[in-house]
């Protein structure tokens, strides 16, 4: 047998395998073993390559372990606590597994000897042939005195393998750090084991409640590249692709997902196989019945439904045209429209089609053409029909706001039609920018950021206020003076209960799978001033494949980025941003009004009755969102006019299905200081 050992960059490996993608700068090097495939070679030796997968490390640099005192809640005599920091990845600490077996949670506590600024923890699992003790569910706590630990600074579930795991978090001053190992990967035993444990340090940062704060980090077992909220339970479902850390080589017929339950803070993992659908780079929309419809992607023709009643995934008929990176949107009658998507399924002009959740069938609309809305991307059609900004509107119409400079109305009756709705003034194409309907009653849409091409071009600061009326009318476009404070591409936006729009992440130059020029300072668009103001920066880059969603408690989940296999920009985590409206002038969390009872369903044009505690002065409905690749066509906000008095209030729902798209919405009430309640879930029916 001929045998050759080489050191190749991850990018070279991808070229060798013929994978068409771009990896991050600074991708790590792997030892690649290439072996002969002669017939006389044993099958066990016919391996193309093996390499470890990296994740994004915490902010800063490794902290010296000099002066540390490490204690473990339990140890096996042959695997003492001292092996955690012996500098030898071939040895490991292990919880007691003989005699009286120690039960989880198992804890490892580090006394640094002095107060330091800590930004994260690195845990290297044992790397021998046994998976015993690989840690899954975990928490990381910090303390200044070793007695008061408070809530975790990071928590979640790590994927079960022997690659190095990180728990990244905002800088914290601490003398003590504790890792709690709650469950073992696979759930087979009660053990915990660690080969090496390290901490990261950086310069201290101050969180300012006047511009919002960043909370604990949620660790997922997958890179959360797509997400939605299950309205009846409040659980957040995220997924990556057929692998937890990579999308390439897809079309495997299954997807790795993870679920965060905010009620328990438990993060679980699940592989979806029954739908035979790799759901990376899909269209995502909630239909009028509240089911999530996920289309295309790596398995480009497939359709999968998430049923909130049973928390299960169901197969639906294939689309008429295979698609990937297409957009989809819910129509005024609850059906789903999709268009474009030449990233997968072939490069050709892909007109619209409609999914009917009642008839359970797709109908092609050959005259709902995509050609008029193509961008002038330097990569051609492969990119120019991606991630279209579309909004369901009156009488089954769809408004296309971008990313092309040209805007359009799409009609979905008969064989469909696409007509001009004007242009975003003189602004260039804005691929991978954002568009958010922050006031559906007034037809107000904010568009911001993006670039003239999908990648390898500078991002812009361009921002516009778009106003739409009746289908077929030319849209009114106002250029927002000054634009964004930071140029952005691959960012995400979430509309808030008060009508402002929160923008997070992105980068100044479009380079997928790189964190270069990452925008760590978020911004807030305020309609009252028609301007953007910066918010409190965070420490974890959120660039390509990142997500953001408004949560029912009026905070924003921001996470993900990467999904590039052998790279150092895989972000297996998310953070919670708490906007300033949840704080009082004293810097403490404000007392919130609450919705104490009332309707949970309402028909379009009907009256929504509810009771509250505290005095409220305003209310709004925000449709539950879904997000991938900076596109969230589900979210929109409807301000409400309040009726009633005292604690018994009501609001008449607009009698317009173009405004009140059927499906699940979040009802928020706000007091005179603008402090919002936790939302009440409302099902709006046609």
Question: What is the meaning of each model-derived region?
Answer:
Residues 52-89, 389, 436, 462, ...:
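Predominantly extracellular/luminal regions of secreted and cell-surface proteins
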Residues 156-158:
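Chitinase-like catalytic core of GlcNAc-active glycosidases
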Residues 58-72, 139, 167-172, 182, ...:
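A short, hydrophobic/aromatic-rich structural module that often spans a beta strand
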Residues 35-37, 54, 71-73, 111-113, ...:
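A structural detector for beta-sheet-dominated domains
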Residues 203-686:
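Kelch-like beta-propeller repeat domains
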Residues 1-24:
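Fungal secretory targeting signals
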Residues 23-61, 74-152, 161-205:
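Aromatic, loop-rich ligand-recognition surfaces of beta-strand-rich domains
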């Amino acid at each position: 047998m001929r045998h050759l050992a080489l050191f190749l960059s991850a990018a070279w490996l991808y070229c060798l395998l013929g994978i068409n993608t771009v990896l991050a700068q600074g991708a790590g090097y792997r030892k690649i073993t290439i072996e002969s495939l002669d017939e006389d070679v044993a099958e066990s030796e016919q391996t193309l390559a093996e390499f470890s997968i990296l994740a994004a490390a915490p902010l800063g640099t490794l902290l010296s372990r000099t002066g540390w005192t490490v204690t473990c809640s339990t140890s096996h005599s042959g695997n003492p606590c001292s092996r955690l920091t012996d500098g030898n990845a071939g040895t490991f600490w292990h919880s007691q597994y003989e005699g009286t077996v120690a039960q989880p949670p198992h804890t490892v506590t580090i006394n640094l000897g002095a107060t330091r600024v800590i930004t994260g923890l690195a845990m290297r699992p044992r790397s021998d042939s046994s998976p015993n003790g690989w840690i899954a569910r975990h928490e990381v706590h910090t303390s200044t005195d070793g007695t008061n630990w408070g809530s975790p600074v990071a928590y979640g579930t790590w994927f079960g393998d022997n690659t190095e795991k990180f728990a990244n978090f905002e800088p914290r001053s601490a003398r003590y750090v504790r890792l709690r190992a709650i469950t073992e990967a696979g759930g087979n035993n009660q053990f915990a084991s660690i080969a090496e444990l390290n901490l990261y340090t950086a310069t201290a940062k101050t969180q300012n409640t006047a511009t919002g704060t960043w909370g604990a980090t949620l660790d997922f077992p997958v890179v959360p590249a797509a997400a939605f909220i299950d309205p009846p339970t409040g659980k957040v479902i995220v997924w990556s692709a057929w692998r937890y850390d990579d999308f390439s080589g897809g079309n495997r017929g299954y997807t790795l997902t993870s679920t965060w339950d905010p009620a328990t803070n438990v993060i679980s993992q699940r592989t979806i196989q029954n739908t035979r659908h790799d759901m990376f780079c899909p269209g995502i929309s909630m239909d009028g019945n509240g089911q999530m419809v996920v289309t295309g992607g790596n398995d480009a023709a497939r359709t999968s439904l998430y049923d909130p009643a049973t928390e299960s995934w169901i197969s639906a008929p294939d689309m008429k045209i295979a698609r990937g990176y297409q957009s989809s949107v819910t129509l005024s009658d609850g059906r789903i429209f999709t268009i474009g998507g030449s990233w997968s399924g072939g490069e050709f002009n892909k007109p619209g089609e409609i999914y009917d959740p009642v008839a359970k069938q797709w109908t092609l609309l050959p005259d709902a053409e995509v050609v008029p809305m193509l961008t002038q991307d330097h990569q051609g059609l492969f990119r120019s029909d991606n991630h279209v900004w579309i909004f369901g509107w009156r009488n089954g119409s769809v408004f296309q706001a971008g990313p092309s400079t040209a805007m359009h109305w799409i009609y979905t009756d008969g064989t469909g039609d696409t007509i001009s709705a004007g242009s975003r003034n003189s602004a260039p194409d804005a691929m991978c920018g954002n568009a958010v309907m922050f006031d559906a009653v007034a037809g107000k849409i904010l568009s911001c950021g993006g670039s003239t091409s999908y990648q390898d071009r500078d991002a812009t600061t361009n921002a516009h206020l778009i106003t739409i009326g009746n289908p077929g009318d030319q849209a009114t476009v106002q250029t927002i003076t000054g634009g964004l404070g930071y140029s952005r591409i691959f960012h995400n936006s979430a509309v808030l209960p008060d009508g402002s729009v929160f923008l997070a992440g992105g980068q100044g130059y479009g380079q997928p799978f790189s964190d270069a020029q990452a925008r760590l300072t978020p911004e807030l668009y305020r309609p009252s001033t028609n301007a953007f103001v910066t918010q409190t920066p965070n420490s974890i880059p959120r660039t390509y494949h990142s997500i953001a969603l408004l949560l029912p408690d009026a905070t924003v989940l921001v996470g993900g980025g990467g999904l590039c296999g052998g790279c150092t920009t895989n972000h297996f985590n998310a953070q919670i941003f708490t906007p300033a409206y949840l704080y009082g002038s004293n810097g403490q969390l404000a007392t919130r009004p609450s919705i104490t009872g009332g309707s949970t369903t309402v028909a379009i044009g009907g009256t929504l009755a509810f009771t509250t505690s505290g005095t409220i002065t305003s209310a709004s409905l925000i449709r539950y969102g879904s997000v991938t690749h900076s596109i969230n066509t589900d979210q929109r906000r409807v301000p409400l006019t309040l009726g009633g008095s005292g604690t018994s209030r009501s609001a008449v729902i607009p009698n317009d299905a173009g405004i009140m798209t059927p499906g699940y919405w979040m009802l928020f009430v706000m007091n005179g200081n603008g402090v919002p309640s936790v939302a009440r879930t409302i099902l709006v029916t046609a």
